[in-house]
Amino acid sequence: MSSGGLLLLLGLLTLWEGLTPVSSKDRPDFCELPDDRGPCRGIFHAFYYNPDQRQCLEFIYGGCYGNANNFKTIDECERTCAA
């Protein structure tokens, strides 16, 4: 196979991997954590994965501490946790 063909194949495989949803067995453990505002008093719109509803939901993050199930965008949450 030519180097151009190999590059095309590599590009297609990379695209496929990026578009394939996360399966529950590949989902990071922190996706199972509850939403956690944290102790600070800021008001930041953030997203967390809700395993019971199997979707990412918005919540208000206080700005500090909390846990790893905390994403700035719904897209980031869905790429990481949603199946």
From Swiss-Prot:
InterPro entries assigned to the protein according to its UniProt record, in alphabetical order: Kunitz_BPTI, Kunitz_BPTI_sf, Prtase_inh_Kunz-CS, TFPI/VKTCI-like
Cross-referenced CDD domains: Kunitz_textilinin-like
Domain BPTI/Kunitz inhibitor residue range list: 31-81
Site (Reactive bond for trypsin) residue list: 41-42
Statement: the UniProt record of this protein carries the keyword Endoplasmic reticulum: no
Pfam family membership, one: Kunitz_BPTI
Disulphide connectivity of cysteines: 31-81, 40-64, 56-77
Organ and tissue specificity: Expressed by the venom gland.
Predominant localisation class: secreted
Keyword Disulfide bond part of the UniProt annotation: yes
A GO term, aspect molecular function: serine-type endopeptidase inhibitor activity
Keywords: Disulfide bond, Protease inhibitor, Secreted, Serine protease inhibitor, Signal, Toxin
GO CC annotation terms, alphabetical: extracellular space
Domain of life: Eukaryota
Residues in the signal sequence: 1-24
Protein family according to the UniProt entry: Belongs to the venom Kunitz-type family.
Cross-referenced PANTHER family: KUNITZ-TYPE PROTEASE INHIBITOR-RELATED (PTHR10083), SERINE PEPTIDASE INHIBITOR, KUNITZ TYPE, 3 (PTHR10083:SF376)
Biological role: Serine protease inhibitor.
Descriptive protein name: Kunitz-type serine protease inhibitor carinatin-1
Organism from which the protein derives: Tropidechis carinatus (Australian rough-scaled snake)
